[in-house]
């Protein structure tokens, strides 16, 4: 019976999530993608004006953060942000943003991402902080605001570093390009290897003389 009930409850939970949080956030993404402020005031934008939208302006302000990862464009940046609401949102956001303009979604994405930057984008969003619901669960379990933010910061920092290494090393392999970013990536990888294989040291323990205690 549990083999039937377990999957059913999991699927039902996803259906409720898809029908509420994901649907609502997709509507918000669509609205902020096609509306913005222009010289004519606040209005709905044409396909070739999407970069002037509310979402476009937000993404453009933050896109520079992901330049070392190879996906420093506002569309990918916004998709990563909406992934904090629910990871499934990334698919819907990418579909909306890259369907604007000429060509298909896949053609527009192929023109924006290289193989290395595509894998870097996936690595970042797979390893970064989970959705808001999971963050809430982490905070409840830790029961400490300070350690909660440390955990979230660690996840985002690890995702950023791994994503950078994936892009820089991937670019070196596919194109042969070598730069400062490649050097940084190699140094980070060396640091990871050291942390994995460094000798384990016993922590200092307190020795108690049981005879004196007795």
Residue positions per predicted region:
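Membrane-interface capping segments at transmembrane-helix boundaries
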Residues: 195-211
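Extended, low-charge hydrophobic alpha-helical regions
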Residues: 27-156
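Core transmembrane alpha-helical segments of multi-pass membrane transporters/permeases
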Residues: 3-34, 76
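Hydrophobic core segments of alpha-helical transmembrane domains in multi-pass membrane transport
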Residues: 22-34, 121-125, 156-167, 186-199
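Hydrophobic transmembrane alpha-helical segments of multi-pass transport and channel proteins
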Residues: 11-18, 89, 129, 156-165
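Transmembrane helix-loop junctions at the membrane interface of multipass transporters and ion channels
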Residues: 136-141, 161-179
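Alpha-helical transmembrane segments of integral membrane proteins
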Residues: 5, 21, 120, 146-154, ...
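Juxtamembrane inter-helical linkers in multi-pass membrane proteins
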Residues: 1-6, 51, 98-101, 213
């Amino acid at each position: 019976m549990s083999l039937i009930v377990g999957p059913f409850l999991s699927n039902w939970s996803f259906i409720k999530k898809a029908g509420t949080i994901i649907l609502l956030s997709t509507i918000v993404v669509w609205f902020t993608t096609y509306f913005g402020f222009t010289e004519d005031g606040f209005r709905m934008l044409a396909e070739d004006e999407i970069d002037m939208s509310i979402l476009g302006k937000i993404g453009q302000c933050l896109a520079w953060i992901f330049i070392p990862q190879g996906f420093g464009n506002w569309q990918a940046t916004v998709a990563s942000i909406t992934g904090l609401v629910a990871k499934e949102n990334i698919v819907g956001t990418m579909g909306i943003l890259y369907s604007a303009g000429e060509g298909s979604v896949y053609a527009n994405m192929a023109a924006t991402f290289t193989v290395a930057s595509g894998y870097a984008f996936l690595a970042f969003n797979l390893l970064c902080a989970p959705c808001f619901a999971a963050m809430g669960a982490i905070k409840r379990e830790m029961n400490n605001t300070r350690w909660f933010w440390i955990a979230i910061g660690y996840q985002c920092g690890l995702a950023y570093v791994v994503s950078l290494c994936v892009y820089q090393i991937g670019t070196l392999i596919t194109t042969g390009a070598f730069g400062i970013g490649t050097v940084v990536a190699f140094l980070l990888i060396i640091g990871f290897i050291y942390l994995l294989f460094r000798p384990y040291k016993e922590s200092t323990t307190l020795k108690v003389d049981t005879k004196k205690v007795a």
